[in-house]
């Protein structure tokens, strides 16, 4: 007699042929009627299962597919971030909002991985954010004069470079400082500047990361100094630019990838070569001063379709009010922004390498790792370290479930199977599951029975020997009991007592002499910082004076060249002047 699964999977046409050529006995009729009733029940159950799966597939199809973001990390940097994070947690200086691997890495790089200086910088950043309400500045602050400010100070983001970073452009030659300060105030402009940075971190950088499928937290800057009047620009630079630079350096460090200063004259290049010696080599390597022939340099890093036409690109944005008003970039794509707001993307370290990008993008979602810290030293990670085998099993089971759901949704959305084939497949899978469950249950039952028989056999075999020779059993039990090991515990207690006495002998507070030394060193550091600020201002003033002298020198050259081109010789000109 055929098996039950074979009876259920026989097509109707084959059954019709068997009726024509084979006489059916009574026993076979009973088995077939039972199999048909069982088949009807299985079809109903499979229909319910397929309907629920189809509904689920439709719900998932309405969502946007998650995207994998490649996250490359250096082993040494990761260790430094772990140490820095532990220090912040111990000092209660790590809010959940800033519990991010890349944020902490930027601050460490800004202080050259000096832990004490980085902790101090982090503490000052948190204090500054609390005093100025930066955490809610996107919702609270409304900059109504934005359009007027754009007229007198054209600036903004436009497109991305070839590596996916946002491109920030400023046209300093178009600045009118007098009208700009009439339209807005210095404090409001600085708050607008901070709000722009917060939007960059919450919208632009995540959108660029999703579009490029790699983590991005820095930008490329282009500053056009064509037509800059340094006489009118001096006061604005002292008040506005210096304060903006301080805000950026103290609270948003390491966000500049490369800066290109274009249309720079000879005077600016002369001053830059002088000032460059006083700056950090790492900072100067990011700044490139270019003249009028800048187009080839910009096209090496930015695609022509992403570069505005006035900078040598092909983008015009005429229907959107110009390139500086359109704010072109991935952050204007509604699908990408929906992923950003729902956090439906996943960071994948490069060393993982589970699947290809397209396959992993269909299977995983950030909702499983949303609020966990991207640095690998969180509480959840410590639990994984304590139970590595359990973590591997859970990861493999999650991957298997995700693969099954992804395949089922893909087959349901692309090419639906016929009803008979779907029923047959569902029946085979259900029967396989039932068979595997029964096999496991029987094996477990047999194993437990064997174990019970072994235990009972040992008890039966040992019982008469113990009854015949009770003295031997008592002696053996006495021999098996080990003597109490008190000596090691006593030694450990003595060691602990000595350690406690040593700690008690130490003073509870720092001596007054050391406190005075620390205060003196802090006062010296503050005075040095003040002197540095003064030297910065003096350098800026001398630089502006050098630029003025260079411009005057160029004007004198032009005037002397026009005088030399005159048709009258010098003695004739003197003769004309005397007459």
UniProtKB/Swiss-Prot annotation:
Q: Extract the coiled-coil ranges from the record.
A: 512-539
List the Pfam families hit by this protein, alphabetically.
Answer: CRAL_TRIO (PF00650), CRAL_TRIO_N (PF03765)
| Record flagged with keyword Transcription | no
What keywords appear on the UniProt entry?
A: Cell membrane, Coiled coil, Golgi apparatus, Membrane, Protein transport, Transport
> Where would I find the CRAL-TRIO domain in this sequence?
145-319
Ranges of compositional bias, category Basic and acidic residues: 379-394
Subcellular localization, as worded in the UniProt entry = Golgi apparatus membrane; Cell membrane
**What InterPro entries does the entry give?**
CRAL-TRIO_dom, CRAL-TRIO_dom_sf, CRAL/TRIO_N_dom, CRAL/TRIO_N_dom_sf, PI/PC_transfer
| Gene Ontology CC annotations of this record | Golgi membrane; plasma membrane
Span list, region Disordered: 372-419
For this protein, the record's Gene3D superfamilies field holds: CRAL-TRIO lipid binding domain (3.40.525.10), N-terminal domain of phosphatidylinositol transfer protein sec14p (1.10.8.20)
Location (main, coarse)? Golgi
What is the protein's membrane topology class?
Peripheral membrane protein
A Gene Ontology biological process in which this protein takes part is: protein transport
Query: Any idea what job this protein has?
Result: Required for transport of secretory proteins from the Golgi complex. Catalyzes the transfer of phosphatidylinositol and phosphatidylcholine between membranes in vitro.
Q: Which family does it belong to?
A: Belongs to the SFH family.
Listed name of the protein:
Phosphatidylinositol/phosphatidylcholine transfer protein SFH9
Native species? Arabidopsis thaliana
């Amino acid at each position: 007699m055929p098996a039950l699964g074979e009876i259920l999977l026989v097509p109707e046409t084959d059954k019709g042929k068997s009726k024509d050529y084979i006489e059916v006995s009574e026993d076979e009729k009973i088995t077939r009627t039972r199999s048909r009733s069982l088949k009807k029940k299985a079809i109903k159950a499979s229909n319910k299962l397929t309907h629920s799966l189809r509904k689920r597939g439709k719900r998932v199809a309405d969502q946007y597919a998650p995207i994998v973001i490649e996250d490359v990390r250096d082993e040494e940097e990761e260790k430094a971030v772990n140490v820095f994070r532990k220090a912040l947690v111990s000092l209660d200086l790590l809010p959940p909002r800033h519990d991010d691997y890349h944020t902490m890495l930027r601050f460490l790089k800004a202080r050259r991985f000096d832990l004490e200086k980085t902790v101090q910088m982090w503490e000052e950043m948190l204090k500054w954010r609390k005093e100025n309400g930066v955490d809610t500045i996107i919702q609270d602050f409304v900059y109504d004069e934005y359009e007027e400010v754009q007229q007198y100070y054209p600036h903004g983001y436009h497109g991305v470079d070839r590596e996916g970073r946002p491109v920030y452009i400023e046209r300093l030659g178009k600045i009118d400082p007098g009208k700009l300060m009439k339209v807005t105030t210095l404090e409001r402009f600085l708050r607008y500047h901070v709000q722009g940075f917060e939007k960059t971190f919450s919208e632009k950088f995540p959108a660029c990361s999703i579009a490029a499928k790699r983590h991005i937290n820095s930008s490329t800057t282009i500053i056009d100094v064509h037509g800059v009047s340094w006489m009118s620009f001096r006061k604005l630079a002292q008040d506005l630019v210096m304060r903006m630079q301080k805000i950026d350096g103290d609270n948003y460090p390491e966000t500049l990838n490369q800066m290109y200063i274009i249309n720079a004259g000879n005077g600016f290049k002369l001053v830059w070569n002088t000032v460059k010696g006083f700056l950090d080599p790492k900072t100067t390597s990011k700044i490139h001063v270019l003249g009028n022939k800048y187009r080839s340099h910009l096209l090496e890093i930015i695609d022509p379709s992403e570069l505005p036409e006035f900078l040598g690109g092909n983008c015009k944005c005429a229907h959107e009010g110009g390139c500086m008003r359109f704010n072109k970039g991935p952050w204007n794509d509604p699908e990408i922004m929906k992923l950003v707001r729902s956090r439906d993307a996943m960071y994948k370290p490069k060393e993982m390498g589970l699947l290809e990008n397209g396959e992993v993008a269909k299977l995983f979602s950030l909702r499983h790792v949303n609020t966990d810290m991207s640095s690998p030293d969180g509480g959840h990670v410590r639990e994984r370290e304590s139970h590595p085998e359990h973590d591997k099993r859970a990861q493999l089971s999650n991957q298997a479930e995700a693969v099954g759901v992804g395949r089922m949704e893909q087959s349901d959305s692309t090419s639906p199977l016929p009803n008979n084939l779907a029923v047959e497949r569902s029946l085979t899978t259900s029967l396989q599951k039932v068979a595997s469950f029964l096999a496991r249950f029987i094996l477990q039952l047999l194993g437990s029975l064997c174990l019970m028989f072994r235990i009972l056999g040992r008890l039966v075999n040992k019982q008469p020997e113990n009854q015949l020779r009770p003295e031997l059993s008592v002696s053996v039990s006495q021999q098996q009991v080990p003597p109490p090991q008190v000596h090691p515990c006593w030694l450990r207690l003595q060691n602990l007592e000595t350690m406690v006495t040593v700690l008690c002998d130490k003073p509870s507070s720092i001596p007054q002499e050391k406190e005075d030394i620390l205060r003196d060193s802090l006062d010296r550091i503050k005075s040095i910082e003040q002197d540095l600020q003064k030297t910065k201002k003096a350098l800026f003033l001398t630089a502006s004076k050098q630029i003025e002298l260079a411009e005057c020198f160029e004007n004198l050259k032009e005037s002397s060249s026009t005088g030399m081109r005159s048709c009258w010789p010098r003695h004739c000109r003197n003769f004309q002047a005397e007459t």
